[in-house]
From Swiss-Prot:
Residue positions binding Mn(2+) 2: D246, D257, E423
Binding, Mn(2+) 1: D257, H339, E384, E423
GO BP term (any one): proteolysis
A Pfam family that the UniProt record links to this protein: PepQ_N
Keyword Protease: yes
Full protein name: Xaa-Pro dipeptidase
Keyword set, alphabetical order: Dipeptidase, Hydrolase, Manganese, Metal-binding, Metalloprotease, Protease
Cofactor(s) the protein requires to work: Mn(2+)
Gene: pepQ
Length: 443
């Protein structure tokens, strides 16, 4: 495999080219990209956990250091002012020397407010990208050049197409997340609580709970019906029935986002339904290719959901086509088939149709779908279908003409298991689709 250093060199060349194009299009001289700042909790002297500006970590794998600045113009070597205070109260990260530092000019910044004297004197034509607009104004950046929409749309659109460096980082994040999922399943099988399963996951991945790319969803039994369940009960339930784990990892700022569901017993209806959702997810991925709308795959999976609802006699006396047409599959899979993945878990530009930011919304029937793009080589997406038993979504169907088609007795029997979700991370290539998750033998 090509070294990360050489992949990074090509990655920087790609970002430089995108920057040149963006600056020319929007008549700017350079971009000043801010890592961000610490923000204190209201009426407290304690800061919230730091989350770096994703446009900053696109350039350098510096994810834990506030008050850093990047100046890029697409021509000269990117210049990084790295915050390096003299501080005996807090940990101070050393000036980086790593695989990437040959391609970036790294300069120590001893004071957070010292950047003003180090920037070019003429700043009227510099664009600022970052979370603190008032800081940009203090530095003399024109208000119209603070997070300019056209520039950000342009950069976001091309972030959809991952460089080989980015894909290498995402494969490493997959390895970490897969280790976590294996440890979590073992913890579940040994009877641990959600809280303790989460600790096992974090230990296996080498993350703190503030470092994972999103809050882990560790859901036992009926908790699996809450799509973004993050409570973490300290007490294990008396009876273990099911376990849904939606948890990722991060490597050099790039995310993995995996979900698996396990049945405590292997010989019940729920276990068979888990197997069938898994099989249908793999079957859908096997059909994927460049040049097809992501929306089409979402719609296709509703047809697969209908097949499973019929097979398991959850919906009866109705054709699969009629189920989809009348949205009887909707309450069972209320979310989208997945989303773009990269520097952010729900990565940007899922609805952008071009580099001008033209927006194509999700279909009215499926408002929670997060991507309407035509799949193209270099894109990374999640494929995460599910079937859930959520009373608030099922309740409206208990009345009316379609109620008789719902096997309410079967649904009541499955509700204590919560739901099922299976999620892999895939890369679209010219002639194939790479399943980064299954390549690591995560069943």
């Amino acid at each position: 495999m090509e070294s990360l250093a050489s992949l990074y060199k090509n990655h920087i060349a790609t970002l430089q080219e995108r920057t040149r194009d963006a600056l020319a299009r929007f008549k700017l001289d350079a971009l000043l990209i801010h890592s961000g700042e610490l923000f204190n909790v209201f009426l407290d002297d304690h800061p919230y956990p730091f989350k770096v500006n994703p446009q900053f970590k696109a350039w350098v794998p510096v994810t834990q250091v506030p008050n850093c600045w990047l100046l890029v113009d697409g021509v000269n070597k990117p210049k990084l002012w790295f915050y390096l205070p003299v501080d005996y109260w807090h940990n101070v990260e050393p000036l980086p020397t790593s695989f990437w530092t040959e391609d970036v000019e790294v300069i120590a910044l001893p004071k957070a407010d010292g950047i003003g004297s180090l920037l070019p004197a003429a700043r009227g034509n510099i664009g600022y990208i970052g979370p603190v607009p008032e800081r940009a104004l203090q530095l003399g950046i024109e208000a119209s050049n603070i997070n300019p929409k056209g520039v950000i749309d342009y950069l976001h659109y091309y972030r959809s197409f991952k460089t080989e460096y980015e894909l290498a980082c995402m494969r490493e994040a997959q390895k970490m997340a897969v280790n976590g999922h294996r440890a979590a399943e073992e913890a579940f099988r040994s009877g641990m609580s959600e809280f303790d399963i989460n600790i096992a996951y974090l230990t296996a991945t080498g993350h703190r709970d503030t470092d994972v790319p999103y809050s882990n969803i560790v859901a036992l039994n009926e908790h699996a019906s809450v799509l973004h369940y993050t409570k973490l009960d300290h007490q294990a339930p008396e009876e273990m029935r099911s376990f849904l784990l939606d948890a990722g990892a991060e490597y050099n700022g790039y995310a993995a986002d995996l979900t698996r569901t396990w049945s405590a017993k292997s010989d019940n209806d729920y276990a068979q339904l888990v197997k069938d959702v898994n099989d249908e997810q793999l079957a859908l991925i096997a059909t994927m290719k460049a040049g097809v709308s992501y929306v089409d795959y979402h719609i296709q999976f509703h047809q697969r959901i209908a097949k499973l609802l019929r097979k398991h006699q959850i919906i009866t006396d109705m054709s699969e086509e009629a189920m989809v047409e009348n949205d009887l599959t909707g309450p069972f899979m209320p979310h989208g088939i997945g989303h773009p993945l990269g520097l952010q878990v729900h990565d940007v530009a899922g609805f952008m149709q071009d580099d001008s930011g033209t927006h194509l919304a999700a279909p009215a029937k499926y408002p929670y779908l997060r991507c309407t793009r035509i799949l193209q080589p270099g894109m990374v997406l999640t494929i995460e279908p599910g079937i859930y038993f959520i009373e608030s979504l099922l309740a409206p169907w208990r009345e009316g003409q379609f109620s008789k088609h719902f096997n309410w007795q079967k649904i009541e029997a499955l509700k204590p298991f919560g739901g099922i979700r299976i999620e892999d991370n895939v890369v679209i290539h010219e002639n194939n689709v790479e399943n980064m998750t299954r390549d690591l033998k995560l069943a």
